[in-house]
Amino acid sequence: MILCLDVGNTQIYAGLFDKDKMVLSFRKNSKSGASSDETGIFLRTAIRENGFDPAKVKQIAICSVVPEVIYSLRGACMKYFNINPFILQAGVKTGLKIKYRNPLEVGADRIANSIAATHLHPGKNLILVDLGTATTFCAVSKDKDYLGGSIVAGLRLCMEALESKTAKLPSVEIVAMHEALGRATIESIQSGLYYGHLGTIKELTERITKECFQGERPMVIGTGGFSYLFEKEKVFDEIVPDLVLKGMLIALQHNA
């Protein structure tokens, strides 16, 4: 079996694969100060408590946007699984042609998403929208050129900024809304977050389409923890919640 670990700004998202099929996924809050022992014990326990044998994990792939976590995570893999993990980073085979001015700046999670999307939909122009701590947009051509994208504050970051930088605005649950007009403070914040983000998705998707694909409509794929909030809005042609993990698996296979 193969264990894929996507290290985000707030969570580690783990997926356990049996060949090409994901049989288990789970999450852990990511802390830059977490020891390799804490992480290794958590991973083994989570796998075992879900009915799988940690000893059957033969390969591990790591994709991280938090560089300081990689060292301790590598140590956890070595100590608790006896595996030197594959790190998705600059210099590995991806199958993509990175058109960023500085390819080293592209986040590993954005590369993983792009690898998976081009594998799932070969020969198509793509816009990938990943709604996590940050909301990222990536444009990938049908020739597997990674063209670039946009990055905006994610829904939770926006909500936390309102709470921490104002005197009276509370923390709220982030939910899909049905009306733009709020009639109480909490509703108003929720509406602003939801429809503000929806507008961002629509506007950036439209502008990227014009700039990258000369108005020819690309396939738009949503992923990340908040992607399902916008399912009813029809802004995505497809929602693939585990896109990043699938991309890591494919990258691992390319570099075997």
Swiss-Prot record:
One of its GO terms (molecular function) is ATP binding. InterPro entries: ATPase_NBD, Type_III_PanK. It is an enzyme of class 2 (transferase). It comes from Bdellovibrio bacteriovorus (strain ATCC 15356 / DSM 50701 / NCIMB 9529 / HD100). PANTHER family: TYPE III PANTOTHENATE KINASE (PTHR34265:SF1). Catalyzes the phosphorylation of pantothenate (Pan), the first step in CoA biosynthesis. A monovalent cation. Ammonium or potassium. Belongs to the type III pantothenate kinase family. Substrate binds at residues 100, 107-110, 185. Homodimer. It is found in: Cytoplasm. Keywords: ATP-binding, Coenzyme A biosynthesis, Cytoplasm, Kinase, Metal-binding, Nucleotide-binding, Potassium, Transferase. The active site is at residue 109. It comes from the Bacteria. It catalyses: (R)-pantothenate + ATP = (R)-4'-phosphopantothenate + ADP + H(+). K(+) binds at residue 130. One of its GO terms (cellular component) is cytoplasm. The gene is coaX. Pathway: Cofactor biosynthesis; coenzyme A biosynthesis; CoA from (R)-pantothenate: step 1/5. GO terms for biological process: coenzyme A biosynthetic process. HAMAP family: Pantothen_kinase_3. Its EC number is 2.7.1.33. ATP binds at residues 6-13, 133. This is Type III pantothenate kinase. Its cofactor is NH4(+); K(+).
